Amino acid sequence: MEEQQIQAYGKINLSLDVKRKRLDGYHDVCMVMQTVKLHDRIFLTREKTPGIRLSSNLDFLPTGEDNLMVKAAKLLAEEFSIKEGLSFRLEKRIPVSGGMAGGSTDAAAVLHLMNQVYALGLSIKDLEKRGVKLGADVPFCLHRGCYLSEGIGEILTPLPNLPACILLLAKPAFSLSTKAVYEALNVSAIPKEEHPDVEKFLYFLKKGDLSEITPLMGNILEKVSIAMRPEIQVLKERLLSYGADVALMSGSGPTVFALFPLEHKARAEKAYQALRYGEDRHLAQQVYLTEPWAEEGGIDE
């Protein structure tokens, strides 16, 4: 049968605060997430032979039942009694275990794609309810744009997009476990003044002036991740040395994004060349130049 495809976009955290650890082991968060144009591609072929199969361009990526894409497909296949075979092919570009919701956005894309291909009639809210069963970031990844994310990540409020700018994404050669980072976070011991001021950030985000927004970006997980891997701090400082307005870790890391205003495109390109091919290539294994996604709505809606 004809192959269907969809794009799955990555995200960065413009502001990330953790309020408390819950009794169920999750954490209540207050964070601002922005879709970026860096994306994976997912292809689906319907087959006569039953079963869910996944292949990837990355040999080290697990493709069995623990993969979130497989879990997402299985969730809808079981609920809607889809008996035919599903063969997924993943072209992965978003860093794996990099703090950019790469696994969550692929799962969200599978939900969207199956909803379209099988005409399931699920609304975005219906998909969110199913997505949160797969992971806290999946509901956000069903959308594109900028959102305030609260609760464990499932309470979403749309926001204005980050103003147009250039984003340099750099992931070191190592990965960090989100679970390990959160387990090492002692949120009750962090003074109030060290928490990102998300409310103030939102005020200036709505005004839309980058020069007022960037000083208020923050990530409460940075200190924890940097304590585990000091190389993240080295990478941040190097990106700032190229003239970035801000260099901040995304999510639990270790990917760092550097933000450059459009008028400083040459600085961004110089940093990219140095990290990708030049004297700083030891600092990052994957380096991309991208920009904020500037259109609201679900994936390929």
Question: Where are these predicted regions, by residue range?
Answer:
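ATP-binding N-lobe of GHMP and related small-molecule kinases
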Residues: 1-98, 116-128, 162, 171-174
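Conserved, helical-rich catalytic subdomain that frames metal- and/or nucleotide-binding sites
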Residues: 143, 147-246, 263, 270-273, ...
